[in-house]
Every structure is written in structure tokens, then in C-alpha cells.
Amino acid sequence: MLILVGSKQGTMSSLASPVSLGSLMGVSSSGRSHSGVRRVSFSRGNCKGRKRWHCLSLSVCRYSVTTTDFIADQGNSVSLDSNSNSSSSSKSGGDDGTGFVLKPPPKPVLKAPDNRMTHLGPSRTTGDVEERNKVIESLGEVLEKAEKLGSSKVNGDKNNGSVNKPVRNNANASPRTERPVNSAASLKSKTLKSVWRKGDSVASVQKVVKEVPKPSYNKNEEEKSQTRGGEKVVSQTRAPQPPSKPQPLKPQQPSKPQPALLSKPSIAPPPVKKPVVLRDKGAAETSVKSKEKKSPILIDKFASKKPVVDPLIAQAVLAPPKPGKAPSPGKFKDDFRKKGALAGGGRRRRILDDEDVIQDASELNVSIPGAATARKGRKWSKASRKAARLQAARDAAPVKVEILEVGDSGMLVEELAYCLATSEGEILGYLYSKGIKPDGVQTIDKDMVKMICKEYDVEVIDADPVKVEGLVKKREILDEDDLDKLKDRPPVITIMGHVDHGKTTLLDYIRKSKVAASEAGGITQGIGAYKVQVPFDGKTLPCVFLDTPGHEAFGAMRARGASVTDIAVIVVAADDGIRSQTNEAIAHAKAAGVPIVIAINKIDKDGANPERVMQELSSIGLMPEDWGGNTPMVPISALKGKNVDDLLETVMLVAELQELKANPDRSAKGTVIEAGLDKSKGPLATFIVQNGSLRRGDIVVCWRSFWKGRALFDDGGKRVDEATPSIPVQVIGLNNVPIAGDVFEVVESLDAARERAETRAESLRNERISAKAGDGKITLSSLASAVSSGKLSGLDLHQLNIILKVDLQGSIEAVRKALQVLPQENVTLKFLLEATGDVNTSDVDLAVASKAIIMGFNAXTPGSVKSYADNKAVEIRLYRVIYELIDDVRKAMEGLLEPVEEQLTIGSAVVRAVFSSGSGRVAGCMVTEGKVLKDCGIRVKRKGKIVHVGIIDSLRRVKEIVKEVNAGLECGLGLEDFDDWEEGDIIEPSTQLRRRGPLKRPQHQWQLLWRE
């Protein structure tokens, strides 16, 4: 271990450096023998101001042994092979200049130590390899310091007494080139590491202590410079470099005889502008770190204003906040100019403006200069973009049509206004000018549309009527991918016909159930789907039967049944023949393109005539097979089950000829047969799968509704996990009640189903508005009534508000169509709410606010809701038969009309003579018909003209006052304000009657002859 001992100022006063460990040195006491330098010290001599290097002890070292010269204090080089007095003089440390100092190595240039004393204490020697490697690194640092001091002395640099940090040697430099030439260990350099690891006793060396005590500096010591040998030495600073492995130093010749060999010529670095502040190792690292944290970021003022990194992020990275409570947001004081600015600066604003221009151009479909991706000059201003948007809006404005197609149902006001390129206000203003006061959304009938379009010079043509048969077009469900995977499926059979012809009774016999007995009024008011096992050809095959209602109000239900069916069974009563709904059912089946099988029912009743029924069917194009046609007709008795098996066999034969197939391995597609709202299960619907398989957990979209399969139920109410083709199932868990007749299909994800449902729901907005029965429809008849309302008494327009609650979605459609048939010239119907489910308190509140009545069709009312309605004085009427509902609505509409007063003629009399009395002239009359009553009104006619209208003041018979005189009797009567009687005048007595106003405006009205 090397120990450097300096002066009291802590600096080395001699230009020397310790030699490499193991350098040979001649000792006079031993003649020409050589010993290795084991310890070198730099001690203070007796003379003041003199410092020397001394070789304290010598021993032979097997590591990097070489011959090194000593350099005297005055610069004289003395070889180690000199006499012993040289050695002794070096030890004595006198002022005679005979002391020896070690020659510096050539490369590293380090600062001289401070004038203060640097004490390096000895360290304990250890035997492990890591400790020795650290010793070598410490020795290398010390040797580099000494080498720099020697180099600065030779080059004449000035020294200010400061000590620099050790400089790391080049890691790529080869240690062989710098190894001493005469080293005794050069022959064993390859095995040097292994020799060192073996722990040779000679290799025990003292370790240099790296931690140097922190000296205290003052300003005078920093600025103080010292001279040695007539030359001023100035300290030089270099950037700190990472430490490198120690390398052996190359021997150097004495300076005087061979000055070029002392060290390699070095170029002094340029002087540093700022004064060097000396700190210890720890202080230097702290200074560097703090400088890096607080160093400013240099930005070119001509560069982009947008920072590469967000200033807030950069500030957080450069100066992370201390742990603790963070400042509350919004308390930073920003410059008032920057408050409204964006975080990204001006360029960010320009980019956003460009995006706005591009977006405007894409939305408005106009060409805006500068809206391209590349910036080319100044963009459009805000005013220019606004002008472009206005121009695009004008271009997209509706254009008045020249020819308008109108159906029988009329048009909405907003739809008509769009077609005429005008506003709804102008249309409504025209209606106001004609005496109509529209309330809310109005539907204008076809005649009124023609009148309005005539004002705008628009031609109106009649559109083709949309028939219910259009709903029964059979949908093609199969795809091209299914053709190779088709399998047989059960047939779907729909039972259709007129009401009370025995459709449900036939199905009850087939299902062995009693459905007809449980139906209200004995009529079907909804579609029932059932799966039945039918024996055929020695085996049992599944069939699906659909029971449709036969009432005229349920035509759409029959159409839906025909659209999904494979075979239509038309039931005709043998004692009743073909009726209106029979013809409609046949038309639906023909429109759907399905085969028809006729079941002539009730052949066991008296008066049954199957031959007459077959004759009637042949007259409408259905020729029986027995008569050479192609329509199977089977006489049956559904009540007793006669010939029902023959009917089923005929149906299965027809189904076999059709070769009904489907692909059960794909996702399901089908049709909604019926839908409703259950108070315990929520929205529910009956699906019939037409292709694929519907499984529990599938995601289904059905027009404006979607469903993630929670549960599937068969026709018996049992849970099932899968529904194969042609199988009807009931599903629960829908987001809302779907529309009966819609097509459903399975989609991949719930998000896709929700998106499609919302899009389709928006497209049905107008249909939902126009679905209200009698939603203020304006017709020419109502217009005429409104115009004449000021002249004719007894007529006025009223409105009946109804809240309808039903059990099934299809029932809403049926009830609405049935009520639309009622005349609405004087009283209009307005359905405020049409929904499925039971009556609730919300319905009662709506009825209170709108003065409406609540009608339930196959719906129930909880007891609490009924009590709540009674307290609110709201009437709730529940029905199970549609006939009763229609009759009550008619009576309610008539009750809104004002009673009409009419004059009814009750008799006739002829004036036979005229008498004078004290009260005036009195007419003697003969009652020819009817009777004459006292205080009744009369009309006096003379030669066919009415000359007076008044009231009988007095009535006498043979001088007795009476109240009435019957026909064939004579009487005398007098009037209070009339006495100009003549013989032959005809008197017509009449009485005033009050009756309920008619729903339909009468063709004529009687003029009131008198008023009380």
C-alpha cells in the first residue's frame, strides 16, 4: 500500500511520482543488489518549504518488476544502480538535493494535491481475490495522479495547489504496450492472474484508501498559486471519467540527458473561463446532479412553438414533486394571455382549425379550399366556413315535388310539408283558415291533401292500396350455404276460417285439450302455436299447428299466420257456408302461395249441407278433388272427432309432397308470431324458428328489439335449451315488446344487436306516430262540420281520449282497427297510450291529466291500482270480448255530444169557424189526426205557407178548459199574440224532444220553430 505524505498545505512540492509496485532499486548497503519498492512515502523534511519522496522500505515483488530511476529534487536523474549515499540521501530528506524521487508515467495528467496534508491511512490486507483487485485499482488511481503531476512539471504548467480527480484510462488500450520493458514479470504475464490468485506471500500489498477526508477550502487558497523551480504551475481540470483497470506504467528516462523520454508531449488544454471550484468526490456528484436538474432547456426561438414534450410533463420529469400533499388543481396562476389558449400552443390551434375545415367539408359535401391534408397557405376563415355550411344547407333543402303519390290513409303534416318544400306552420295555417284547429300531430286524409296540393300547383295521384295480403308473402329464409346441409323439418299448419266455425275445437281434438272452453266468449283472440305428434304411416311425426282468430278485426294476425305456414287448413261450417272471413283466409293463403286443405266441419248438425259448401268453394276457384280439382276437401266433425284422422293423413301427404327442409346447424332465423308483456316475466314473445336452431344464450335482434336468451319455453310451458326448425318457443328477457310479424335472427354480439335495434327503432318513428287510432285525422267531412258549426246548432267536434292496455301486441292492432270503423265526424278518437300489460298507477295519473278513460282488453287491474283509480275518479273498464269493447266506445262517443232538440208533429187540425171573445178572436177547430195539447207549439199554415209559429195559450172543449183534445173532436184554441184567423187554416201542433247527438252528421236538420 502506498502512503503519500506531503507538506502542511497538502500538496506535493516535488515534481515526482511513485514508481510502479515492484520497481527495482539499488541499495548501497547491498552493493549492486536490487530490491522491489514496497512502500513509498512523501514526508516533510527538516528544512521549511522542502518536500521529498522517500523510499521507506524495499522488497522484491513479483508483480511488474522493473528498473526505475530516481529524480532528485532539483531535477537530476539518478539511476537505481548508483551508490548507497544516493539511497541514504533520499531517506534523510535533507536539502542537499541528493534525495531521490520516482519518475512519473507518461500518459495521465492529473492535478497536484492541495497544500493541505492528505493522510492516507493503512488498510488491512486480506487474502481474497476481490480485495486484491480493488487494491490494484486503487494503486492505478494513485499512479495516475503522480503521473499527471510529473507531466505538468515537465510542460511548465502552472499549479494553483488544487487536486484533480483521477482520469480513467482508455479501456481499449492494450496493457502490453504500456508494460515496463525490463519487468521481471513480463515472461509470466499470461499466468499473472493465476499466480496472484494463488496467494503468493510476496504479493501482499497495502491497499489505498479511497475515501479522502473532506478538506476545508477558502477563497485565498483557491486563488493561490505556487512556483517551483522558477516556473509557475497552474492546475488543470478535466471532465470526470469512469475508473478503469490499472495498467503498468512505462519506464521513463531522466529529464536532463533524455528530456524526450520523460513523458509524451502533451498539449495543454485551453484555459477554462470559469474558475474551478474544488470539492470532494461526494460534493462533486451532488453538484452535477443538481445542475442537471436545474439546467434550463435551450429552445430556438425560431423553432416550432409546440414543445416536443408537454411542459407540465417535462417539469414533472426534471423536477419531480416532493412526497406530500399535492397542490389543489386550479390554483396555479397562469398568464392571462394563456388562459384561453390550448395546451399545444399556436400550432395545435392551427391543426384543430384544419381538422374543423376538413370535417366541415366532409359533412357538408362541399369543396372548401385548404381542406386537404397538406397545408397550403391560409385556411378559410370562420365566416367563410359558416357561409359554406349555409350554402350546403340550402343545397340540401327540400325541393317541391311536381307529382305527389298519396295512399288511402293520407299523409302526416310534416311529410306533406317536406314534399311541398314548405313548413308545417304554413300547412297548419291553411287548416286554421278553413276552420280546423289541429291539436298535436295530425294526419290529413287523401281528399284534404289534394285540396292543399292544389294551392301549391302539385299534382296528386292515388297510390296503390297496401293490402293485408301483402303481409302474407312467404319469406325466403334459406341461404345458398344451407343447400348442402338441409334436413327434414316438421310442417307448420295454420288453421284458418270464419269465427265460430270450429277451428279451436278441431285443434282441441287433435291436441286432446280443452282450449276452446277457456277462451273468453268462445272466440280466439290471439295466435296459438302448438307442437303435436301426429300418427302417419305407422309412425308418429311432429307437426306444428297455428290457431288464428277468425274475427274481422284480426286480419293481420291471419296474415302473419299465413306468412309462416306450410299448409293452410280452411275450416268451413257445413250449416253456415262461406262467410266474409272465410274468403279473407282463402285470399291470405293464396297470397302466401301455400297449399290449401278444406275441412268442412259440423257435418253432424241438423241442416248441414256439405255439397252446398263444396259448390260455393268451387265458385271462388277451389275445385274439390272429388270433382276433378286439386283442392282436398274432408267432411269432419271436430266435436265428435269424426274423420279427423283422415284430415290429418291428408295434411301429412301434402306436407310430404312439399319436401320441407331446413338447416339446423346454422344460426336461427324466424318470425315473431305473438308478443306481449307479462307482469312477472316482463316482455315476452312467441318465436317460430324457420331455419337454423335457436339456443339458450343466443343474442337475437328482432327489428327494434334485441334479446339475450335467458330462457326458452315450449308450448307446454316447460324449459327447453334448443328450438329446432319449425318449432315454436316462447322467449323472455327482451328489452321491449317486439312487433308481431317481425323477423328475428341471431347476431354475433350484444353490441351489434343493440346498434341495429336502435337504428331500426328510429326508422319506425313515423309509424309509431301514425299508429294512434284517430289521431286527429282531418277529413273533408270534419272540415264541413267545422265550417257549418257556427251556423248549425247541435253539432260540435269532440275528442275521446283512451288509454288501452292489452295482453298481446297483436291485440292492439285488432282493437285499433275495430274502433277506426266507428264514425268520427263529430267525435274523434285519440289513443294516448297503447301498451301491453296490466293497468298500473302511471296509467291512472295519465288519465287524470288528460281526462281519459282506461280500457283493458284481456288485461287485469290489481286491487291497489283500482283503489287508486277510485280515489282519482278515473274509470277503468275491462273487457274479454272485443264486441263489448266496441259497443261501449260507441256509447262513450255519443255521450260526448250535446243533446239535440227536435220538434215532433203530434197531430193536425183545421179551422172551421172564427169566434170573438173578451180576450180576442178564437179559432174553432176540428182535430183531424193525432191530438192537440195545451202549451204545445203550433205552426199555422195558410195556402201551404207558415204564417205563424207560436204556443197554444188556451184550449177549450164545450166551454171547458182541457189539457188535450184527441182526433175527431172539436175544440177552440186561442193564441196570445195571434188572432188573424181565417177559415181553412191548418194547425200543426208539435212538441220538443231531446235526444243523444248522432256520431255521424245527419243529412238534414229541422229548423227550430220555437224556443221556450
From Swiss-Prot:
Database matches in InterPro entries: EF-G-like_DII, IF2_II, IF2_N, P-loop_NTPase, Small_GTP-bd, T_Tr_GTP-bd_dom, TF_IF2_bacterial-like, TIF_IF2
Positions of region (G4): 601-604
A molecular function (GO) term: GTPase activity
Biased composition annotated in UniProt, kind: Polar residues: 152-175
Regions of compositional bias (Low complexity) in chain numbering: 75-102, 183-194
UniProt name for this protein: Translation initiation factor IF-2, chloroplastic
Region G3, annotated ranges: 547-550
Subcellular location field: Plastid, Chloroplast
Ranges of Basic and acidic residues composition bias in the record: 208-231, 277-294
Pfam families membership: EF-G_D2, GTP_EFTU, IF-2, IF2_N
